Every structure is written in C-alpha cells, then in structure tokens.
Amino acid sequence: MTWINHCPISCWGGKKWGFDSLVHKTIFVGILGALLLISGCTSLDYEFTSSTVGGKHKYGDSDPVHEWEGGAPHKKPIHGVDVSKYQGDLNWQAIRRNGIEFAFVKATEGGDRLDEKFAKNIHDARRAGIPSSAYHFYYFCTSAKKQARWFIKNVPRMRGSLPQVLDMEWNPKSPSCRLRPPAATVRKEMEIFMRMIKRHYGQRPIIYTTVDFHRENLQGHFKNDVFWLRSVKTHPKVTYPGRNWVFWQYTGTGRLKDVDGDIDINVFAGSRSQWSKWLKSAIK
C-alpha cells in the first residue's frame, strides 16, 4: 500500500492541474506546500492494491475476522485501545507491554453520568506512558451545552493529552432516551458541543461514529475534523466512502496478553513517522 499525506481536494478548489515542464511542476509543488501549511489540513489518505486482504492478527480476538474487504488492519504499526468501566480494573503496564500506543478513556455520558473508572484509567494510562484522552458519549435527550459543561467539569486539562473525543452513535437500547433528532439538529448540537470543548481545551474533539449514524447524519459534513470510525468487518474506505479518517476501531472483541476479557482495539491510519508528526500537531 502507498500512504500519502494529503489535504481534502476542497482545500485548493477541486481543480485538476496539468503541467508540461519541470519548472512549472516545481513551482506548483512549492505553492501547494505553502497552501497545505496555511490550511492546516492533517488528514491521511491511503491506497490498497487488492480489494480483499487477510493476514495474521497482531492481537488475539475472541471473534476474529479472517478476511477483510478493502484491507486488513493488522499490519498497521500503531494500535490503541478504548475502554470504559465495563473492562473492570485494567493493568495499564500490561497494556503498554502489548505494544499499545494510544488510548481513549470513557469519561462522561449525557449531562449527569460519570464513568466510575475514568479517573483511575486516565491516570494509569498516562503513568504507563500511553498517549490518551477522554471521550464523551452523547445523549440525545439533553442539550449540547449541558453535556459540554458536564464533560468540562469532570475532565481536567492535562498536559500532553490527545484531543478529547465526542462519541456520536444511536443508542436503541437506552432505558431512558431513544430519541433520534433530525440530521440537521444533530449536526447543530454537535457543533455547539465541539466549539465549547475547543474553547476550553484548545483542540476540537475527535468525532467517533458508527456506520448507520454516519450515513444518516454526517456523510458530507465535518470535512475538516478528525474522525475515528467503527468498522469490524470491512476497511473504512468501503464502509464510509469518501470519508477521511485518522483512527479505525476494528474490533470490540480483542484480546491482549495479561489483560482479562475483551477490549476494543483500534489502529492509526498512517505510518509510524506519520504518527509522530500527528502527535506533535495534536497534543497540547
């Protein structure tokens, strides 16, 4: 596969350029480089040479996928986890020894729920040297402002933190709120939440989402934001056509040595050098 640092085509107007001379090409590359620096675009793109790629799993899995449409995640160099109280007491030193290099930790839900393991998980992840941040599970029966204030109240600013995360997905099993607002309302509330988080922490949050939620609400929107996508059987380029992404949650049934039970495992979209560059630009 070939990895390319790129900015969405909209950054330079979507025009197709053609040049006949090396001089013109050199001038264009210089201009384009300057435009990329100005725009601040940090998306990653990819190319797969085959439509179905298998491969040996990097980690164990209690329900493994043996053939991935569009490309497998296992050969990616940078893997991470996301956790909540449901994983119980975690041994973060063991997680680090498994080669895990980033973590997203559940902090809050709605406007009044705090994950009881958040403080310990975020402390222990950071102590183990794993770049990490907190995520908020959005609740559609509470205003975005109230939810952002609740998150800010419970998640301190932490030097060296990854950007915080806004988890956007439908919750059909919720005992208290199964509301599904119109897509325009969803996006409006998301923007309110994200702006409040940006003002407080200095970074716009990463957007985590699922296939159905993205299709119904986010397709074609938030083009300059960082996306973390769930896709457990196919590559995101198949499941989320046209969406640039940075993180991919590829299993909810991963297994790590010396860590009890199933755990969500994710990959970063690019190479190790791209990871280093992304960290430098993203960490505050």
Each model region followed by its residue ranges:
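Functionally critical loop-and-helix segments that line ligand-binding/catalytic clefts
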Residues: 45-80, 222-284
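Intrinsic-disorder-associated, low-complexity terminal segments enriched in Asp/Asn/His/Tyr and depleted
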Residues: 5-6, 20, 24
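C-terminal motif of bacterial Sec signal peptides marking the signal peptidase cleavage site
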Residues: 38-40
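Substrate-binding cleft of extracellular glycoside hydrolase catalytic domains
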Residues: 73, 77-89, 106-191, 198-200
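Sec-dependent N-terminal signal peptides
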Residues: 24-33
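Catalytic domains of cell-wall/extracellular-matrix polysaccharide-remodeling enzymes
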Residues: 163-241
